[in-house]
Amino acid sequence: MARKSLIQREKKKQRLERKYNLLRQSLKKEMSEVSSLDDKLDIYRKLQSLPRNSAPTRLRRRCLKTGRPRANYRDFELSGYIIREMAHACLLAGVTKSSW
């Protein structure tokens, strides 16, 4: 189980990313349309003035149940270990243990 402070920090990053997403996209689009170097530098400074944690690359997918940051399945938003436990407890329909 991840520490609660790490989970809250990740939620804060998600809120910041949603808040500044449209502004960041519009600035990037504006930068691609502008040809003068001075204008590009001005736009670049505006991008840099945005909060660091509002960048989408700073986000990390975490398991919804445990908060584990690794081995997550994107479709389920759960870690592999939790999916395995749920399959063994017959909570996932159609999942059987493989053998060969």
Swiss-Prot record:
Domain of life of the source: Eukaryota
Gene3D superfamilies: 1.10.287.1480
Main location: plastid
GO molecular function list: rRNA binding; structural constituent of ribosome
GO annotations of cellular component type: chloroplast; small ribosomal subunit
InterPro entries: Ribosomal_uS14 (IPR001209), Ribosomal_uS14_bac/plastid (IPR023036), Ribosomal_uS14_CS (IPR018271)
Functional summary from the UniProt entry: Binds 16S rRNA, required for the assembly of 30S particles.
Family: Belongs to the universal ribosomal protein uS14 family.
Subunit structure: Part of the 30S ribosomal subunit.
Name recorded for this polypeptide: Small ribosomal subunit protein uS14c
Source organism per UniProt: Cryptomeria japonica
Gene that produces this protein: rps14
